[in-house]
């Protein structure tokens, strides 16, 4: 990542996509980052966008939904969330949008899907929740929750900030309409990465310059992107590929290789943590959550 960032600043620090060598290379490196990360996450290249941070990306999305929704329609958020995926949505209450809170069980920190079902009705347009809570470490069943929301006619926005560092997920298989995470917490530069599925991205109002309205990955980037940091994000794919090759995983980049590294990281984390869990699980003065 650092080598790519340094090379961009030293050799490519020009406006990308112009008809001369340095500019063409600059654009190619930005495209490389987007296409390789999208392939790992099982989505189309155009469905992956970059922005300054996950919080900033969510604020842009909230503005799009503010224009898209009618007063009286509802958004479901949780009290288990990273602030980036709750604060921007809650502020839409000032615009007449109803905010419904899917609350955790205070004894376990768990989000019960039965409680979600009681909140869902024809007025709910969006359900927001974390893939993994940054407070209690709870892993939420994204596919199951997404299916419930979709059956009720709602879209789904998943905050993956606390999950992605443990292995990039296959968003295409999980099924949410939006998936957000932070590159700088996932072996990358200071960027927010946002997957928006094509169907929803086309429905939401354009938030970018009018001349970018027809390009999905530009529609939710209001300002000029950080060219160098986007290009450097390809280093995240380099790292995943290097891990796969070192541990005998798939040679070809893409979702299969990403899944191998995801499972590799998960197994290593479990092995490291299990002795601690074994030590504390029988203690009367410690209660495990998540």
Residue ranges and their predicted role:
Residues 1-290:
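Pyridoxal 5′-phosphate
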């Amino acid at each position: 990542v650092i080598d790519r960032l340094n090379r961009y600043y030293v050799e490519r620090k020009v406006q990308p996509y112009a008809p001369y060598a340095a500019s063409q290379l600059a654009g190619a490196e930005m495209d490389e980052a987007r296409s390789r990360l999208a392939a790992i996450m099982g989505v189309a290249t155009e469905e992956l966008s970059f922005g300054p941070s996950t919080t900033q990306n969510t604020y842009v999305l909230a503005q799009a939904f503010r224009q898209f929704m009618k007063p009286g329609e509802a958004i479901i958020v949780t009290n288990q969330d990273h602030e980036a995926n709750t604060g921007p949505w809650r502020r839409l209450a000032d615009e007449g949008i109803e905010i419904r809170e899917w609350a955790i069980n205070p004894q376990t920190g768990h989000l019960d899907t039965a409680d979600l079902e009681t909140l869902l009705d024809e007025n709910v347009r969006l359900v927001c929740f974390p893939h993994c809570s940054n407070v209690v470490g709870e892993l939420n069943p994204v596919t199951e929750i997404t299916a419930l929301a979709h059956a009720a006619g709602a879209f789904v926005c998943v905050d993956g900030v606390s999950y992605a560092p443990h292995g990039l997920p296959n968003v295409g298989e999980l099924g949410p309409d939006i998936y957000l995470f932070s590159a700088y917490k996932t072996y990358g530069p200071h960027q927010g990465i946002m997957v928006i599925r094509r169907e929803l991205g086309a429905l939401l109002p354009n938030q970018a310059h009018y001349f970018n309205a027809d390009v999905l990955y530009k529609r939710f980037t209001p300002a000029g992107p950080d060219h160098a940091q986007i290009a450097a994000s390809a280093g995240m794919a380099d790292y995943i590929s290097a891990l796969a090759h070192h541990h005998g995983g798939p040679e070809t980049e893409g979702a299969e290789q990403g899944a191998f590294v995801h499972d590799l990281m998960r197994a290593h984390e479990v092995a490291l943590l299990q002795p601690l869990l074994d030590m504390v699980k029988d203690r009367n003065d410690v209660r495990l959550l998540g």
